[in-house]
From Swiss-Prot:
ATP binds at K234. A motif ('HIGH' region) lies at residues 8-18. The keyword Kinase does not apply. PROSITE patterns: AA_TRNA_LIGASE_I. One of its GO terms (cellular component) is cytosol. This is Glutamate--tRNA ligase 1. Belongs to the class-I aminoacyl-tRNA synthetase family. Glutamate--tRNA ligase type 1 subfamily. The lineage of its organism: Bacteria, Thermotogati, Thermotogota, Thermotogae, Thermotogales. It comes from Thermotoga petrophila (strain ATCC BAA-488 / DSM 13995 / JCM 10881 / RKU-1). The gene is gltX1.
């Protein structure tokens, strides 16, 4: 059975590179009818925290990536936190010492970086006197090779490696040792991970060989890069799933975009993961690094916002507002839906959607500085707004066609140019110069609200 794992370290928020690795593992497991395991690699005692662990789990859930075994739900091969498996690592490390494939190293008490001697016998006396003791793995001469699913045949000369620590003096394992023991005991069949782990692979394969265990199939995925073609980091901009969620990126759009980063997908590049799941093949992943394009992500997100059912978008928007701490004023349900319908055509994120919808939902909106300076301070502003108010008041049928006719008739009265007339009215009823189409904006606002807002702007004009 296919068994894959995603094993983050809880030392920070979930990076988009980690999310993409989790996605590829999850897709492979789901397509093959296998298991997706979540393991927490928290042996970095200084930087790891349960708070980060919970944030990572929450980000994965938001991404739509569920797991079959993990620290929160358990499973047949737990515990799923490395900090809860210390006795297991100690037992296996001591077995390597027994087999003369590893040995104890005793260090100077005053200078812990200074090795005093090595031994195959546990140095009780020195340990009791406070000397640091580690276990080192013995690197044998020769070559270590494996077939990478993406990169092909890989070979390393063992002479380039020195004996390396597998158990630290504090009783915690090092990464390369713990990951081998865990992957073997958890019966992991495939390891898909970033190519930054490629240099770890020969050490891990040596440990597999020392135990006489079969190694999993490895695939090392090229990293996500910044605009300067170096690994994506904070200096390029935001990198965490949590940030993009807070900015109003839909989870389905983020997963869509991350899948496009390196996976050759046939057909339309706007899709849900479920739509492409059965066509996923790890061998279709590119062997070249890919640049994270923030604008492309927004574009993909905008496509999804206009693609999904209005009720789904409404639910996503309300959930996002709660998460981002944004208040949604209480308005009529139908009015809210109509506002959402016309506003989603103009924006690419839920955050932008909130900004453009806000004046629709709040009568106490502010006027943009550009509107006031470029239009409201014009000599003809008051006359245009008064005429608009009168024309709308006399309008019996409130629909887009009649509204358009009314505004075009008004613009032909010679009060001002059509652009000035339209922008004066647009800003008067929303406070903004960029909105959905003016005619449909006024139609959705309704007659009563439009008249009140024109009067409000006239009063504002008289005070300034």
């Amino acid at each position: 059975m296919v068994r894959v794992r995603f094993a983050p370290s809880p030392t920070g928020h979930l990076h988009v590179g980690g999310a993409r690795t989790a996605l590829f593992n999850w897709m492979f497991a789901r397509k093959e009818g296998g298991k997706f395991i979540l393991r927490i690699e928290d042996t970095d005692t200084e930087r790891s925290s349960r708070e980060y662990e919970q944030q990572i789990l929450e980000s994965l859930r938001w991404c739509g990536l569920d797991w079959d075994e993990g620290p929160d739900i358990g499973g047949d091969f737990g515990p799923y936190r490395q900090s809860e498996r210390l006795e297991i690592y100690r037992e296996y490390a001591e077995k390597l010492v027994e087999d003369k494939r590893a040995y104890y190293v005793v260090y100077d008490k005053e200078d812990p970086s200074k090795e005093l001697f090595t031994t195959y016998e546990y140095p009780h006396e020195y340990k009791e006197k406070g000397h640091p003791v580690t276990i080192k793995f013995k690197v044998l001469p020769g070559k270590t090779s494996f077939e990478d699913l993406l990169k092909g045949y890989m070979e390393f000369d063992n002479s380039t490696l020195e004996d390396f620590i597998i158990m630290k003096s504090n009783g915690f394992p090092t990464y390369n040792f713990a990951v081998v023991v865990d992957d073997h005991l958890m019966r992991i069949s495939h390891v898909f991970r970033g190519e930054d782990h490629l240099s770890n692979t020969p050490k891990q394969l040596m440990i597999y060989e020392a135990f006489g265990w079969e190694a999993p199939v490895f695939m090392h995925i090229p990293l996500i890069l910044g605009s300067d073609r170096t690994p994506l980091s904070k200096r390029h901009g935001a990198t965490s799933v949590e940030h993009f969620r807070r900015e109003g990126i839909l989870s389905r759009a983020l997963m869509n975009y991350l899948a496009l980063l390196g996976w050759r997908v046939e057909g339309d590049e706007i899709f849900t993961i479920e739509e492409k799941l059965q066509s996923f093949d790890p061998k279709d992943i590119s062997n070249k690094g890919v640049i994270f394009d923030y604008q492309k992500l927004e574009w993909v997100n905008g496509k999804h916002m206009r693609r999904i059912d209005l009720e789904d978008l409404k639910r996503e928007f309300i959930e996002w507002a709660k998460y981002a701490g944004k208040e949604i004023p209480s308005v009529d349900e139908r009015y809210f839906s109509e506002t959402l319908r016309i506003c989603r055509e103009k924006v690419n994120t839920l955050s932008q959607l909130y900004d453009i919808m806000y004046p629709f939902m709040n009568d106490d909106y502010e006027y943009e500085k550009d509107y006031v300076e470029k239009f409201l301070k014009r000599e003809e502003a008051e006359r245009v707004l008064e005429e608009a108010k009168k024309a709308f008041k006399d309008l019996n049928s409130w629909n887009m066609e009649e509204i358009e006719k009314t505004l075009r008739d008004l613009s032909e009265k010679g009060l001002a140019s059509k652009k000035v007339v339209f922008q004066l009215i647009r800003g008067a009823v929303t406070g903004k110069l960029v909105t959905p189409g003016l005619f449909e904006t006024i139609e959705v606002l309704g007659k009563e609200r439009t008249l009140k807002r024109l009067e409000r702007t006239l009063q504002f004009l008289k005070k300034t």
